[in-house]
């Protein structure tokens, strides 16, 4: 039903406009019954109703948490949130590649800023006792010099940790100039240390790029162990492109969805061996319950999706948890 509607209606709309329409529907989903609580899953000291989460980038401003929870997501990672509000990159900046069940985005961390989003999360928690696990993905503002990046991450941690269940440090988006340079350990160490110092003891994850070399990923894993952080989110979007003649593949930005699955699994296997006892959240190319089970069998503790939700619709998370 949804796939037919997607092909007839949503596919013809600008991808970002369609996203805003979908967000309106999801906000109404907040009126649906709360999902049935199965046996909770304990990860990083947090109780999840299931292992399926919404990846960062879908709910940038913490406006859809209740609706996504009622659609079956056990956790929602909002953001990326920066210290100051910013509009992001010029439009168009979101593109579908339906033949590949993929998206390309160059959004550029458009968000309302840490103070406004912190207040929104505060109100949400005051008004609702039953919520999913809420992760807050944090980053630096576009105009902040790389040498000043630790201060941006520290500011976000101070403003948001109180209302987050966990923090995710984003140093891997391809859409903020120079951001990926912060994955080098000499740059990453002060960022992670200052986030830890300002996190109120909340679990901290590092979101990494699939385009990093295996050695660079192992260096990040070593740093996570040294600083005793909770774990890693693998992976963000990729700047590589699969073979194909689709016009959208020429657009710049990060590619997500089915073409990312192979590299995402490679990174998962690599990091599971390097991070015994740490939490790994696997992201990238997950579409079916079989995909979820494969990631769990490879050592992931939780999984996240975004593009799969776009292509398979509002019932997707519940289908995954039912094993369909």
Functional labels for PLM-detected ranges:
Residues 23-31, 173-184, 220-278, 316:
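Glycine/Thr-rich beta-alpha phosphate-binding loop at enzyme active sites
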Residues 1-42, 105-110, 114:
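An N-cap/entry alpha-helix motif that binds or orients negatively charged groups
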Residues 141-153, 181, 206-225:
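Active-site glycine- and acidic-residue-rich loops that bind
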Residues 61-68, 212-226, 273-275, 286-303:
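Catalytic cores of alpha/beta
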Residues 74-86, 173, 231-239, 286, ...:
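Glycine-rich phosphate-binding active-site loops on the catalytic face of alpha/beta enzymes
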Residues 85-101, 241-256, 302, 308-324:
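C-terminal helical cap(s) of enzyme catalytic domains, especially alpha/beta-barrels
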Residues 79, 84-130:
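A gly/proline- and charged-residue-enriched helix-loop-helix capping module
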Residues 45-53, 129-136, 198-212, 271-282:
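Short beta-strand/loop segments at the ligand-binding rim of alpha/beta enzyme cores
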């Amino acid at each position: 039903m949804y796939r037919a509607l997607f092909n007839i209606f949503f596919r013809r709309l600008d991808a970002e406009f369609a996203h805003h329409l979908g967000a309106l529907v999801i906000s109404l989903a907040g009126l649906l019954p709360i999902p049935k609580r199965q046996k909770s899953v304990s990860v990083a000291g947090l109780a999840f109703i299931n292992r399926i989460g919404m990846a960062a980038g879908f709910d940038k401003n913490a406006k859809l948490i209740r609706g996504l929870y009622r659609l079956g997501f056990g956790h929602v990672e909002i953001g990326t949130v920066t210290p100051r509000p910013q509009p992001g990159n010029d439009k168009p900046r979101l593109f579908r590649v339906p033949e590949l069940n993929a998206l390309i985005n160059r959004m550029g961390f458009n968000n309302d800023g840490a103070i406004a989003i912190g207040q929104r999360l505060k109100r949400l928690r005051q008004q609702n006792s039953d919520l999913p696990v809420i992760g807050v993905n944090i980053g630096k503002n576009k105009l902040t010099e790389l040498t000043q990046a630790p201060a941006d991450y520290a500011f976000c941690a101070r403003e948001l940790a109180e209302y987050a269940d966990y923090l995710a440090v984003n140093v891997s988006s391809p859409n903020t100039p120079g951001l990926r340079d912060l994955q080098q350990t000499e740059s990453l160490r002060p960022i992670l240390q200052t986030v830890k110092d300002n996190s109120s003891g909340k679990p901290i994850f590092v979101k990494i790029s699939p385009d990093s070399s295996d050695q660079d990923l192992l260096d990040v894993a070593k740093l996570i162990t040294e600083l005793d952080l909770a774990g890693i989110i693998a992976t963000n979007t990729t700047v590589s492109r699969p073979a194909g003649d689709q016009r959208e593949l020429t657009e710049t930005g990060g590619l997500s969805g089915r073409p990312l699955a192979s590299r995402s699994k490679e990174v998962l296997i690599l990091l599971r061996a390097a991070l015994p006892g740490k939490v790994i959240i696997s992201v990238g190319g997950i579409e079916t319950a079989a995909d979820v089970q494969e990631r769990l069998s490879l050592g992931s503790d939780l999984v996240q999706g975004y593009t799969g939700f776009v292509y398979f619709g509002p019932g997707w998370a519940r289908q995954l948890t039912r094993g369909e």
